[in-house]
Amino acid sequence: MAKEKFNRTKPHVNIGTIGHVDHGKTTLSAAISAVLSLKGLAEMKDYDNIDNAPEEKERGITIATSHIEYETENRHYAHVDCPGHADYVKNMITGAAQMDGAILVVSAADGPMPQTREHILLSRQVGVPHIVVFLNKQDMVDDQELLELVEMEVRELLSAYEFPGDDTPIIAGSALRALEEAKAGNVGEWGEKVLKLMAEVDAYIPTPERDTEKTFLMPVEDVFSIAGRGTVVTGRIERGVVKVGDEVEIVGIRATQKTTVTGVEMFRKELEKGEAGDNVGVLLRGTKKEEVERGMVLCKPGSITPHKKFEGEIYVLSKEEGGRHTPFFTNYRPQFYVRTTDVTGSITLPEGVEMVMPGDNVKITVELISPVALELGTKFAIREGGRTVGAGVVSNIIE
């Protein structure tokens, strides 16, 4: 299939494979691309191609990730696969690869394992909204009862982490067999199971709202005063659309203020509207330059509120990644870099956790010295003297 054009006519969805090491995530990724390539919907990627994941940097953290793309009859998918468990943890916490849904791969021969549980928990914490399950290595299980037992265990595990375990689609098959069939040039009985899995992914994982359809939010990067025109705030619109005449709120650091947009410009040109992804200057009516600062956000009124205290799931960089060389304890006070600014905060570790070592991932409670616009899923970096020592995501807002 030629690579030249990106088909924009089909809705786009981001997914990824998750699950325990050696349960077949990468083999399944290869099998999906191989089976769909026979239908002219993907380029075949073999296992080694995917397993040799290039390293990427996201928020100062090196993560090995493979990206493959393919289509079904209904959608265009970007699919991410990570070689190592630590890469998954980092990927999910930094949001390097935002997932609209995930395919949880569980070996039917082994059942759920520690990382199966950990990936489900992480999915819950970082807000992966939907999971579809592939029970792999079905060809190695002769006993139908054993297969049913594993399925039941997986459903219970999903329910334990507040996913709808009873309603989750679970497809059994063999990624390796499907891949072998596809390499021989046909979609056989195992390939059909992969197609069935993709049909479930199509049906069960909803098409995400596009960024432009969400409520308006723009982190403030800079503030200028233009003689005779008023105050301009600049930044990159994170989501939604802003138009002249819109009422907006300025949230974070200080008390929330309301104002009206009197102009939107990009590269010195006036625009009717700015939308997600645009770098714009927004002119605000009656707002003084000293009332706005970097680290605040402009948003649709009532859509996001300032908070000081929250719980977060964090990954702490190892020494090799340029992180700390020593553990930290409760009352550690680093800076939390949220969107465009650093705010000092103090960390409380969960009960029973004495200290956190470089390379760990853990749930923490944070209390910031000044309030910042936060919501579930807001990403942050943890910094010490300007260098990144960790990354996290807000999993619960306390006050």
UniProtKB/Swiss-Prot annotation:
UniProt: GTP binding residues: 19-26, 81-85, 136-139
PROSITE patterns associated with the record: G_TR_1, G_TR_2
Annotated tr-type G domain residues: 10-209
Annotated segments matching region G3: 81-84
Region (G1): 19-26
Region span, G4: 136-139
Catalytic activity: GTP + H2O = GDP + phosphate + H(+)
UniProt-annotated location(s): Cytoplasm
Record's GO cellular component terms: cytosol
Xref: SUPFAM superfamilies: EF-Tu/eEF-1alpha/eIF2-gamma C-terminal domain (SSF50465), P-loop containing nucleoside triphosphate hydrolases (SSF52540), Translation proteins (SSF50447)
Keywords annotated in UniProt: Cytoplasm, Elongation factor, GTP-binding, Hydrolase, Magnesium, Metal-binding, Nucleotide-binding, Protein biosynthesis
Binding annotation for Mg(2+): 26
UniProt-listed Enzyme Commission number(s): 3.6.5.3
InterPro entries attached to this UniProt entry: EF-Tu_GTP-bd, EF-Tu_GTPase, EFTu-like_2, EFTU_2, G_TR_CS, P-loop_NTPase, Small_GTP-bd, T_Tr_GTP-bd_dom
GO MF annotation list: GTP binding; GTPase activity; translation elongation factor activity
Region span, G2: 60-64
Gene3D superfamilies: P-loop containing nucleotide triphosphate hydrolases, Translation factors
G5: annotated segments: 174-176
Annotated NCBIfam families: EF-Tu, PRK00049.1, PRK12735.1, PRK12736.1, small_GTP
Role: GTP hydrolase that promotes the GTP-dependent binding of aminoacyl-tRNA to the A-site of ribosomes during protein biosynthesis.
Complex and partners: Monomer.
Record family assignment: Belongs to the TRAFAC class translation factor GTPase superfamily. Classic translation factor GTPase family. EF-Tu/EF-1A subfamily.
The protein, known as: Elongation factor Tu
Gene behind the chain: tuf
